[in-house]
């Protein structure tokens, strides 16, 4: 299974919030946001900070998706 942060990006769009604002409010780095943009894993501490800043549960910012391998 792979991680997807598409829910987070949609939430930011719905709230008309820029990534820079999230970085400031959650106290996370631009590097972390870049990793999330590539659907790479980040620590639960980071996810907790984002959830706290947005006042949402973790399921509202990420999901696990099937990891398809090409043959």
Question: Predicted regions span which residues?
Answer:
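Short, charged recognition helix plus adjacent turn
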Residues: 2, 10-11, 15, 35, ...
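Short basic helix-loop element that most often maps to the first helix and adjoining turn
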Residues: 6-25
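Conserved hydrophobic/aromatic packing and binding residues within compact polymer-binding modules
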Residues: 22, 33, 61
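Recognition helix of helix-turn-helix/homeodomain-like DNA-binding domains
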Residues: 28-42
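Short, basic-rich loop-to-helix N-cap that marks the start of a DNA-contacting helix
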Residues: 39-52
């Amino acid at each position: 299974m792979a991680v997807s942060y598409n829910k987070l990006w949609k939430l930011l769009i719905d709230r008309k919030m820029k990534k820079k604002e999230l970085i400031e409010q959650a106290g996370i780095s631009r590097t972390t946001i870049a990793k999330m943009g590539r659907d790479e894993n980040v620590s639960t501490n980071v996810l907790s900070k984002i959830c706290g800043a947005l006042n949402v549960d973790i399921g509202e910012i990420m999901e696990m998706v099937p990891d398809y391998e090409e043959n």
